[in-house]
Each structure stands twice: as structure tokens, then as C-alpha cells.
Amino acid sequence: MIIDAHAHLWNPQAGRVNGKPVIPLTGGRSDFGGELRQMMPPYMLDGRNTVEMLMANMDYARVSGCVITQEYIDGSQDSYLLECKEKYPDRMRITCLYEEKPIADEWMSRFDGVKICGGRLENQDLLAHEEVFAQAERLGKFVAIDMADGDLQTDAMEELIGRHPDLRIAVGHFGMVTVDGWEKQIALAKHKNVYIESGGITWLFHREFYPYPSAVRAIRTAIDICGIDKLMWGSDYPRTMTAITYDMSKDFVEKTTELSDEEKRKFLGENAEKFYGFPKLAVPDKMINMVE
């Protein structure tokens, strides 16, 4: 069973970057704060990034479950994600978006976790946001956080982990693996309830491109730091699909000889099943494609 620990959905996209709006266009493009960007594959024509499209990709790639995280650049997708979870209650785990203001207990309780965009916070001191960490711990929710580059926030995170030992934390973007100091983010997973997910790793190594040998070496380094049991695969769908297919975002792991079969099973699904509390999910059938 494979689980994608880092994917995005939006309907519609209505975020901001550097104080400027992000506006969906046609052909998978967006006005990204005044710059034209290919936000997702061009066949996603109408600017919507829907759960039906994601599930079709997951089925073809034989991915059983997914975790939907959020980003300021997409705008809050809380309401849409609740709709998605109603359609796919077993296959999805969803987060509400922390926007540096209080979240009502009743609202957070409707989600599986809360997303904190650590590197995009107006106040970058994580200790100033302790209330949301404490709230998630109290309500039994996980925190998904993409931290600022390198070790800029690791000391504060260590402090928060110590204060809230029962809080489950998933650190995203594989610790911003191509930035000096990334190993300190990985080392946070030495704590019992802290895990690392690799959403965006193909973006971070995009200049090298498939089959991403440096990404595989980074996974091996992370195993040496915190152990394979704390690492989870994530695709960062759909933005990474502007360069590769959804299946390619994981099959470089499946095909490498640098990881054992047991390490692959844990990284691609078993660890996420445990961390996010997924039930035993069916594995989508293999579909023969037109070039096989």
C-alpha cells in the first residue's frame, strides 16, 4: 500500500504571494503575483485542481491514500477539503490552514490536522505560534509544517516538541534538503512523534531530474540520521507534475537499488499509514497502458 503524504487541492485557487494575488488562468497557468507561471499540467484546463483529478492519478499510479496539505499561495481550501473528505473518507486525510489567527476548536475538530506554513509566517518565531501547537495536541490532531530554510527554526521547534511531547508533527519538503542545514530538520525526527515527509523532493532536485540519484542519496542520509521508520513519501501534486508524471514522483524510489525492499515499503506507505491513522486500504489494480 502506497500513501502520498503531501498533495494539494484547490477549487478555486485564491491565494497571495508577497502580498500580491495568485489568480488561476487557463491551461494550468496562474498569475503568480504578477508573473505568469505554469502552476500545474496544461491539461488541467480551467484552473481547478479537483479531488476527482487527483484520485484518477492515484488510481493509475496505484496509490491508496493521500494527505492534503495547504499553502498560502493557494488560499484557504478548508471548505473544499471538507467536501472532498465526505467523498473519500478513508482515502484522505485533510488539514485546515493556519493563517496566524485563532482557529475555533469546533472548526479544527473537523479536520485531521492543521497546516502551518512555517517559512511564510509573518512572524517567523515559531514560539510566537505556540497556541496552535497546543491546540492541535489537545484535540488529537497532527501538525503539518513546512519549515523555513535550513536550521532557522529548528531550535524553536525543539522547544515546542519538548513542551508538547504528545503532538504528532510532520515536517515537509524533506527539511528543504538542498539548503545548508537541512540535516537539523531531519534530526527533529529523533523525537518519538516527529516524522519527515518528502513532498517537493523532485522539485528541489529538478535540475538533476529523473531518476534523481541525489534525492535517493539524501533519503539514505536521512535514514542514517533518524531511521527509516520516520520517513514518508510525498508527491507535492500537482505543481511537481509540470515536469514529471504523478507515477514518476514515486517510481524513482521503487526502482532504485540503493534502498531495500523493506525500506521502500516503509517509506512509500507503511510509515504514513501509522502516523496518519489510515485504515487498511485497497491497492488499485494495475492498469496496462497504451505503450506497454
Residue ranges and their predicted role:
Residues 1-5, 12-60, 65, 220-221, ...:
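Mid-to-C-terminal alpha-helical segments outside catalytic/metal-binding sites
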Residues 3-7, 66-69, 92-96, 112-116, ...:
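Hydrophobic faces of well-ordered beta-strands that scaffold small-molecule active sites
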Residues 8, 71, 97-101, 117-119, ...:
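Active-site beta-loop-alpha junctions enriched in small/polar residues
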Residues 46-103:
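A metal-dependent hydrolase metal-coordination microenvironment
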Residues 93-109, 116-124:
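Substrate-binding cleft of extracellular glycoside hydrolase catalytic domains
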Residues 121-232, 274, 279-292:
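Catalytic pocket-lining loop regions of alpha/beta-barrel enzymes
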